[in-house]
Regions:
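Helix-coil boundary/capping segments in enzymes
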Residues: 1-256
């Protein structure tokens, strides 16, 4: 029997709000997008043109890395030998301040992912992108999409508005646990706070290395705030977190 290899983190790229997402937005947000000329909502965590954001041989002639389904299929399945892959769309919907706008855009992203990616290749699954700006709306999005078994986890950013163990997020974790959906905490920021504990860096690589601090803080928060005690069946996945910090972190946490 052939081994199953799952690429747990590939990134379909949203081409643009006024192009890619417009057909999937409701009438209100369609009008807002057009009248306000809202287009690119790429997170600064992953600038599309930065070499660090995509391999040179995975960049289409036109468009962002990850915007060409056939190129992504070739990279994930043919070149790397994966038998399955999970789509995690990292886009600015998780960073906007208007919670209703965030929810509308997250719905559109999830519907676009289902229609333009999952429906075209049975080897693809996806994470449900959540508007954590409003936990009640995040729960609604989980309930809306949980019956579609092509969605296998929920996606949140490592650096959001506050620590993920706080009680106002508990309804989200309860819904995820109820539907057996792991919480995928992915590298990235909503830029509400500095990425380091003592302020803002000057350079991209400082930010990149500082992300380990965010993951450490989130792990501590989930444990010490009692999330796993309240929801013992909840599973959490750290995406693009690195692992080299974990042994020293575990030693210090246990020692304390």
């Amino acid at each position: 029997m052939a081994a199953t290899r799952i690429d747990c983190d590939i990134h379909p790229a949203v081409g643009g709000t006024r192009t890619t997402l417009l057909p999937y937005l409701d009438d209100h947000w369609k009008e807002q997008v057009v009248s306000r000329a809202i287009d690119g909502l790429d997170l600064n965590s992953y600038p599309p043109n930065m070499p660090f954001s995509g391999r040179a041989d995975w960049r289409p002639a036109n468009g962002k890395p990850g915007s060409d389904l056939k190129m992504v299929q070739r990279g994930a399945f043919d070149q790397l030998g994966s038998s399955h892959a999970i789509c995690n769309v990292v886009y600015g919907a998780q960073a906007v301040f208007d919670s209703y706008m965030a929810a509308g855009f997250c719905r559109a992203i999830n519907d676009w992912t289902a229609a333009e990616w999952l429906s075209k290749d049975s080897r693809l699954s996806a994470s449900i992108v959540l508007p954590l700006q409003a936990p009640d709306l995040a729960v609604e999005e989980i309930e809306r999409r949980a019956s579609d078994n092509r969605f296998v986890s929920v996606l949140v950013l490592a650096q959001g508005e506050t620590l993920l163990g706080r009680r106002h997020y508990w309804p989200v974790w309860q819904a995820a646990a109820k539907h057996k959906l792991p919480v995928a905490i992915h590298a990235g920021s909503a830029y509400r706070t500095a990425p380091s504990s003592i302020g803002w860096p000057s350079y991209r690589y400082e930010y990149y290395l500082a992300e380990a601090q965010a993951f450490q803080a989130q792990v501590l928060s989930l444990i010490y705030e009692g999330v796993f005690g309240k929801f013992p069946d909840l599973k959490v996945v750290l995406m693009e977190s690195g692992v080299s910090w974990l042994p020293a972190f575990m030693w210090r946490a246990n020692k304390t």
